[in-house]
Amino acid sequence: MNYYSIQNSRDSSISSIEIRICSSKSIVKKSSRILPNGNIVGEIKTAQTMNYKTLKPENSGLFCEQTFGPIKDFECACGKKYENEFIGFCAICGIEYASSQVRRNRLGYIKLVSPVVHIWYLKYISILLDIPLKSIESIVYSTDGIIFKNFFQKPKKNQILKKETFEITENLNNTYFKDSINLKYSLHVQKNIISYLKNLKQAVFILKTKQDQQLKYNFSYLYYTLNNFYSLSYSFQWEAKKQWNTIIWFFKYKQRMKENFIKIDPLQKKLNDEYFEKTFLFGTSILYCWLKYFDYNFQLLNLERQIRFTVFEIKEEIKELSGILFSYFFQKQQFISFQKKIKKLNWKKNKVFRRLKLIMYFRQAKLQPKWMILSSLPVLPPDLRPIVELGSNKIAVSDLNKSYQTIILRNLRLKKFYNNSAFNEFTEEIRYTKRLLQESVDELIQQDKSKKNNNISSKSLSDILKGKRGRFRQNLLGKRVDYSGRSVIIVDPELKLHECGIPLKMAIELFYPFIIQYLISFNLTKTIPGAKHIIHTKASFLNEIIHFVLNNYLVLLNRAPTLHKLGIQAFKPKLVTGKAIKLHPLVCPAFNADFDGDQMGMHIPLSFESRAESWKLLWSRNNLLLSSMGSPILTPGQDVVLGCYYLTSNLLDKVKTYIKPCHLNKKGENWSIYFNNLNDVLKAYNQNKVNIHTEIWIKWSENIMFENNSLDLRRLEVYSGKFFRFQYENYQINYNLKGYQLSQYIKTTVGRVIFNSLLY
């Protein structure tokens, strides 16, 4: 399991937190405590929780007060309270006088009879041992086993071996290999003897399938898999670096309850030949036996060197094949075959790189690979997995308690089988119980996906921690606070830059206490229940009160993730209809928001300091530039640019549908529409008399600047006895008969008038 290593902690201040693998010894050390009477507590021995009569925790159970602390502050199970400061625990029940808060941080542990693999590290064990994941799973869950065939047999009569060679073969396969190996063989091994032993040995590494098929492999075939272990003693050295790829495979077994291995001793002549030739191995103990020889100081360093040498060889082979590949460019079959070889080598190189990266991590972090296998299982503090009374004789029990109970019961059953001489390591009962124990630990840590699909509501530790509803994101990082709401954002260009639209329902919920306060202060009601009744009945004057409240407050809008300071800005709320928050489109780039379903959180600053900072620092009118580069942040988006183009474009000459029938004369020609001012144009547009792209002439009293090509005179119109008109392409000037200018008109569209009214 993982643990938190807190460094440099003084006065409850945490300077750094490190998450790493914890050994089984560390789990026992952190979970055990020595009482003043000398008793060591911490181990959970029974699956019981509470006594059904007294409703008190059972001793050595999952809620034991001796292990986790008292339920009531400074009170033991006997009912005695803390009085004497020199006596820290009760001599009768053995419970320490302490605060009940210790039941939130004190751990316990379960001592497992058979080691189990942590399900999170199953894949890494497969990478480290360079064995397929399915094979590792079959060993862990005891569905398949390993048939270990003895590499060296005593010489038969028809075989003649040298005495020196036979001594080496006997010693290599001895149970006490490290003790019995001679010094003259441990320093240097002759090349011819090594090559002879390599050809002599044959290993059978068989995973039994359901059809009981046995696949036999030569030692040379398992050469890559088996030779990845540096499992010899420290005194054993190879003569040359090239012999790193040659490692003698052996096992060392001890008949102990902690390590349920089979004692293999070729010098033991009492064993019959059939039992001696093949040995069946099952369970996680095999993996623990392999991993315990990995030491980050020596074996992993040598293994890292070996893998680097293997990577170099693969790269050289790829380089050589790549050079040959171009010579067969015009020969299709040879080209494809070489291409497949290179692809296979690249896959092998990536696999070796992944293994090298894992080994380097173990070495640099100074971790032992055997820590990935658990012999002691930590138990969470009881207040994190409580039993809650719901009333009416009903209780709610945490799912973790059921998982712990299952583990303890299966562990006790396995211990009972081991204590019974009728059962041994190879019986079906022990194999099945080992598998059940491994599955129960897996369900505690991470539940199987197949069981989740069966609508089983029990939660594992991973389900409690991970995801949106997990402990981190739900309770620690995403805490719910008062005076806050959340809704979808939509665009509203009619809002001002510093305004945001807030729905009526959200405004009532957020400003609920303030509305009640104003209702009482305006003498509309005298009691709080009366004010609540006015709000629930939605009286006619309620909107006026809400408008009055909103004028005195700013609201903070936040869009996750908040990557910079512009991710939170203050706006003046404006009451709108609907259920969505309305926002001006130009403030969206600061939030990195768009209107495709994004949500934003709304908060109300309450204190005087926070309200002052909202007006001065967070108000959107004051956040116009990026603090990093100084460039403007209120840049129009694509929809704004497209809308401005559509609003100001002149499509009358191309699209005839924009001309209303009332604007055509008897000949079908377009009438010229004249307006005296901009307001008349907007009124006509709101009355649906003109369209956005309708061409109009509007009277203009300001100075006008034109391009040179637009001042070509089109025609001169003379009105009898009144005035005459000079008409250009987009410009008209009226003069009286004495030559004084009467008025001037410019040609534009309704959309351009609307755009001009928005700018000025």
From Swiss-Prot:
Zn(2+) binds at C76, C78, C90, C93. SMART domains: RPOLA_N. GO terms for cellular component: chloroplast; DNA-directed RNA polymerase complex; mitochondrion. The keyword Metal-binding applies. Binds 1 Mg(2+) ion per subunit. Mg(2+) binds at D594, D596, D598. It is found in: Plastid, Chloroplast. Its EC number is 2.7.7.6. GO terms for biological process: DNA-templated transcription. It catalyses: RNA(n) + a ribonucleoside 5'-triphosphate = RNA(n+1) + diphosphate. Its cofactor is Mg(2+); Zn(2+). The keyword Chloroplast applies. Belongs to the RNA polymerase beta' chain family. RpoC1 subfamily. DNA-dependent RNA polymerase catalyzes the transcription of DNA into RNA using the four ribonucleoside triphosphates as substrates. In plastids the minimal PEP RNA polymerase catalytic core is composed of four subunits: alpha, beta, beta', and beta''. When a (nuclear-encoded) sigma factor is associated with the core the holoenzyme is formed, which can initiate transcription. This is DNA-directed RNA polymerase subunit beta'. The lineage of its organism: Eukaryota, Sar, Rhizaria, Cercozoa, Chlorarachniophyceae.
